[in-house]
């Protein structure tokens, strides 16, 4: 995840760093790996406010990330690098040799078209 830092041309710009989104692929997420995420807005099952000052925010879809990576010794190709609204890391859509797709957390320096493999 590249981070852009600014020169201190004004007082408010001193020490300012932002995430550079230029490396992301501009496309829609894979629908088979997404599902809806219900937001509570600080309310419990009775509808009463249990956490004050918490709103609903923007509507999000949850991307199912494969943390296990249990397809050992099978190469996969990185198809997209996407923004994930539910975490601070970028995610990568990979396609295995048997045409199965999954999301993984994208490490620094990962590019589209790169081959990845998980082994024990």
Identify the function of each model-found stretch.
Residues 1-87, 108-120:
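Basic, glycine/proline-rich low-complexity segments that contact nucleic acids
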Residues 91-96:
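Short, acidic/hydrophobic/Gly-rich beta-strand patch recurrent on exposed beta strands
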Residues 101-105:
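Short alpha-helix capping/helix-loop boundary micro-motifs
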């Amino acid at each position: 995840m590249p981070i852009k830092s600014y020169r201190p041309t004004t007082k408010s710009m001193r020490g300012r760093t932002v995430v550079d989104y230029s490396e992301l692929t501009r496309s829609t997420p894979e629908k088979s790996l997404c599902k809806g995420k219900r937001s509570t807005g600080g309310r419990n099952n009775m509808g009463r406010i249990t956490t004050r000052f918490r709103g609903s925010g923007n509507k999000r879809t949850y991307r199912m990330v494969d943390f296990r990576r249990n397809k050992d010794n099978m190469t996969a190709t990185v198809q997209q690098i996407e923004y994930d609204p539910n975490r601070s890391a970028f995610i990568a859509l990979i396609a295995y040799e048997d045409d199965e797709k999954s999301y993984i957390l994208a490490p620094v320096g990962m590019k589209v078209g790169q081959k990845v493999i998980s082994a024990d």
